[in-house]
Every structure is written in structure tokens, then in C-alpha cells.
Curated annotation (Swiss-Prot):
Gene name of this polypeptide: EMB1687
Source organism per UniProt: Arabidopsis thaliana
Major site of localization recorded for this protein: nucleus
Acetylation is among the record's keywords: no
Protein family: Belongs to the eukaryotic/archaeal RNase P protein component 2 family.
Protein name per UniProt: Probable ribonuclease P/MRP protein subunit POP5
Lineage: Eukaryota, Viridiplantae, Streptophyta, Embryophyta, Tracheophyta
């Protein structure tokens, strides 16, 4: 039996709270749902319903860290370039303008997880002095969650 081939994309999300489209001062909170919806909308706009249907087979946002803004997206090996292009063309999540930067593409979740863990730890060390107790607790929870990431 042949296993299903996936690609895992590690991305960094840059939020721009100063240029909020509605003029409100609060930036959006990054969640798996928000990111997934933005990418699916981009696939629909750029590739149509057929492109969206072919991409949804294994598309999933596996991990999102709302503090460091790192996320892991899974897609099928056949459609990963289409998903990658759609990710590049995402301009906003909700009403907040964003830029998505691809950091790594991997064929297995373990390699992507290790890279994400390394990036998360580096970013956490850089900004740990300016974080509140709640944010530090949330960051530690996110680090534990990524260590358990397998499927």
C-alpha cells in the first residue's frame, strides 16, 4: 500500500496593524480558522472552484502560534505549488493586511516541526523580556503543542 504524499509548509505571518482596512486599531488574532479561510479564499479567487476542490483533499493548517506568528500548512504533493502560490497571494486575514513568508517546505511533519520549534524558540528568546505572564504561559503552551505534532 502506498502512503499519501504530503508537503508541509512552514510560514511566518507579518501582520500590519497600522494599515487596518476598516480603520480600527485592533489587529486580528491569528487562528487556524482565520488562516485557513484566507488561504482557501485565495485559492478560490486565483484558481476557481476546480482548483479549490483539488486542493482541499489534504489541505489543513496544522499549527499556528499567535505570538510568534509561525504556522504549518499541509497540502498534497501534487497541489502544493498551487497552495504555495495562493499563500503568496494572500493580502489580508480578516480586515488586517498581512504578508506571508514561506520559511521551509518539507515532505514530513517531523522535519517541519523541528524547524518550527527552532524558529519559535529563537523568536521567543528575542521577545521574552517584553511579554506579559499570560503571553509567556501561552507561548509555553504553544511550544508543548508543537512538540506533540505528528499527524
Amino acid at each position: 500500500m502506498v502512503g499519501f504524499k504530503n508537503r508541509y509548509m512552514l510560514m511566518e505571518v507579518f501582520l500590519d496593524p497600522d494599515k487596518d482596512l476598516l480603520g480600527e486599531g485592533t489587529p486580528i488574532i491569528l487562528t487556524q480558522f482565520n488562516l485557513s479561510k484566507a488561504i482557501k479564499d485565495s485559492i478560490l479567487v486565483n484558481f476557481g472552484e476546480c482548483g479549490l476542490g483539488s486542493s482541499l483533499g489534504s489541505f489543513q493548517v496544522k499549527y499556528v502560534n499567535p505570538i510568534t506568528k509561525l504556522c504549518i500548512v499541509r497540502s498534497s504533493r501534487e497541489e502544493h505549488r498551487q497552495v504555495w502560490l495562493a499563500i503568496t497571494l494572500v493580502k489580508s486575514i480578516g480586515n488586517c493586511p498581512v504578508i506571508l513568508n514561506l520559511l521551509d517546505i518539507s515532505g514530513c511533519i517531523r522535519a517541519c516541526r523541528d524547524t518550527a520549534l527552532k524558529c519559535d524558540k529563537e523568536k521567543f528568546e528575542q521577545c521574552s523580556k517584553s511579554l506579559s505572564e499570560e503571553e509567556i504561559r501561552q507561548m509555553n503552551t504553544s511550544l508543548e503543542k508543537i512538540k506533540l505534532l505528528e499527524n
